[in-house]
Amino acid sequence: MSAQPISDFYAYPDAAGHFGKFGGRFVAETLIGPLQELSAAYDQARQDPSFIAEYDKDLKHYVGRPSPIYHAERLSREVGGAQILLKREDLNHTGAHKINNTIGQALLASRMGKTRIIAETGAGQHGVASATVAARLGLECLVYMGATDIERQKINVYRMKLLGATVIPVTSGSATLKDALNEAMRDWVTNVRDTFYIIGTVAGPDPYPRMVRDFNAIVGRESRAQMLEDYGRLPDAISACVGGGSNAIGLFHAFLNDPGVKIYGAEAAGDGIATGRHAASIAAGRPGVLHGNRTYVICDDDGQITETHSISAGLDYPGVGPEHAFLSDSGRAVYQGITDDEAMAAFHLLAHTEGILAALESSHAVAQSIKLARELPKDALVLCNLSGRGDKDVHTIAAREGLAL
């Protein structure tokens, strides 16, 4: 916890990209120049009304925003306690929040004259969203994906290929998201002249954590306005799943200076934090440097990154965005572990009560929201970010339950 209370969370990051003691730019000398170029281009674009207008137009007419807030009445009755509201990011084009960010970064890539984009992906949703905007803008697209994740996300792999992207399997390390990000960074160093790296989460060196946050902040801005319009007040609590944490920071950001809104992040506790088979970086990690920024990481006593586990490919990452680390240390947000079993139970309960198949990532937030609702009075409002749809996870769920499709 910070010794001094934070009076304005919007004062972060500072000019060097730091969120308190987290964030920054810890990279090889060869990347300093490209990152400075990217930072300058982004700072210029975000002040350009024509760029903002083009981005907003795409969000409305291509993505289909605004996404609605849905009152899950049957789920709320089944659970007892507070009313559970769902921010329906699963209804966006491509089926998740990821396209909010890829559209913004792809427009920036075109503005910078880049002709090739690369991306990393875990669950495949960021890869699909990157391939989608690349197709729309006529850009070459390569997506790095861990071989383990390719096996458990075959549908999204094929979707990327249908959209014209090349999917590069990564077999190093644990062959998951961390390793895909490593390979994408190596590609960018080699091909920086014509290549734009669209990072999919609020990690990486500055300016990525703030840039990805800003492009996803539409989720929170919409939610805040919708809550005031539909309910006449802000929610009592908000919840989102956290791997790197892009969907979560997108929701959280609009509420950071509202002390009456409690903020909760759901990390992947896997088989249980005590087992060591999890991906709960804040709950069980320690400060360290990963992928160019200082944050909480899952590592051994020598500081070496250790393997993680989650049923959800998109949460299977040994770090977390530096702003989340900062929010945790400041006490503004609380991060809790949700196990595979809890996420699976929430997936089924939401399907049976509301007819909605949530992504396994999002199901962690649904599980957390259910726990919160049970502790709150009936007139309390819990807003859960349903960050993606679960079509991509049907085979994983069936296999876990011993069914062959």
Swiss-Prot record:
Record PTM N6-(pyridoxal phosphate)lysine, positions in chain: K98
Catalytic reactions on record: (1S,2R)-1-C-(indol-3-yl)glycerol 3-phosphate + L-serine = D-glyceraldehyde 3-phosphate + L-tryptophan + H2O
PROSITE patterns: TRP_SYNTHASE_BETA (PS00168)
First-level EC class: lyase
InterPro entries: Trp_synth_b_CS, Trp_synth_beta, Trp_synth_beta/beta-like, TrpB-like_PALP, TrpB-like_PALP_sf
Any one of the GO CC terms: cytoplasm
Amino-acid biosynthesis recorded as keyword: yes
UniProt EC number: 4.2.1.20
GO molecular function terms noted in the UniProt entry: tryptophan synthase activity
This protein's record includes keyword Lyase: yes
Keywords attached to this entry: Amino-acid biosynthesis, Aromatic amino acid biosynthesis, Lyase, Pyridoxal phosphate, Tryptophan biosynthesis
Pathway stated in the Swiss-Prot or TrEMBL entry: Amino-acid biosynthesis; L-tryptophan biosynthesis; L-tryptophan from chorismate: step 5/5
Cofactor annotation: pyridoxal 5'-phosphate
Description of how the protein assembles with itself and partners: Tetramer of two alpha and two beta chains.
NCBIfam families given in the database record: trpB
Record family assignment: Belongs to the TrpB family.
Function comment: The beta subunit is responsible for the synthesis of L-tryptophan from indole and L-serine.
Name of this chain's protein: Tryptophan synthase beta chain
Organism, as annotated: Xanthomonas oryzae pv. oryzae (strain MAFF 311018)
